[in-house]
């Protein structure tokens, strides 16, 4: 339940003076609360352990960056589509992907998986990682090889207002024949 970590955060903000508010100390307090809640049969949300990502064109490939709001967890990942485990590679810095692959990652603490597994299927095609002429940072997502999910908050969707008109020009680098174009849309 997301309610329980949020209630603890509200209490911390209300009861602590501004000079006493420290994120690292709050995390330790929250860990103690979580142990108590679990002993009472309450399953608090572990969303703070979930991983955020950014996949952007870079150096002829895609730069993959991972992050978590919890600085005390280890992000472990695989690039072969297998589930991450306590002995999987530890994420230390962004890396460049140049081929189709499935990245799976999760946050671990003391060898235990804490958050949900993030699955990033990266698909390479003639447009992946290429320049978009006249692009803004949001439109770069359209050539990052990651398809948006049904969750519009996954960071993979570009949006325009109803009166916006867009023109996307893809630079494929040479005269290559494109046989078909697949464009995913989520209409609100």
What are these model-predicted stretches?
Residues 176-188:
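A short beta-strand element within beta-rich, extracytoplasmic domains
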Residues 167-179:
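Extracellular and analogous surface-interaction loops
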Residues 17, 21, 27-168:
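Short, compositionally stereotyped local motifs that mark structural "simplifiers"
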Residues 1-21:
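Active-site core of glycosidic bond-cleaving carbohydrate-active enzymes
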């Amino acid at each position: 339940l997301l309610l329980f970590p949020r209630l603890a955060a509200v209490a911390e903000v209300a009861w602590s003076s501004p000079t006493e508010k420290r994120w690292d100390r709050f995390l330790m307090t929250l860990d103690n609360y979580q142990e108590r809640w679990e002993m009472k049969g309450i399953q608090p949300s572990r969303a703070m352990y979930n991983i955020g990502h950014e996949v952007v064109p870079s150096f002829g490939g895609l730069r993959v960056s991972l992050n978590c709001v919890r600085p005390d967890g280890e992000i472990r990942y695989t690039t072969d589509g297998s589930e991450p485990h306590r002995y999987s590679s530890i994420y230390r810095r962004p890396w460049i992907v140049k081929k189709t692959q499935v990245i799976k990652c999760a946050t671990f603490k003391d060898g235990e998986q804490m958050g949900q597994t993030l699955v990033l299927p990266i698909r390479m095609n003639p447009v992946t990682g290429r320049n978009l002429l006249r692009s803004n940072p949001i439109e770069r997502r359209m050539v990052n090889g990651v398809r948006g999910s049904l969750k519009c908050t996954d960071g993979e969707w570009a949006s325009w207002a109803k009166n916006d008109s867009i023109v996307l020009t893809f630079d494929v680098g040479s005269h290559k024949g494109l046989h078909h174009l697949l464009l995913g849309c989520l209409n609100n």
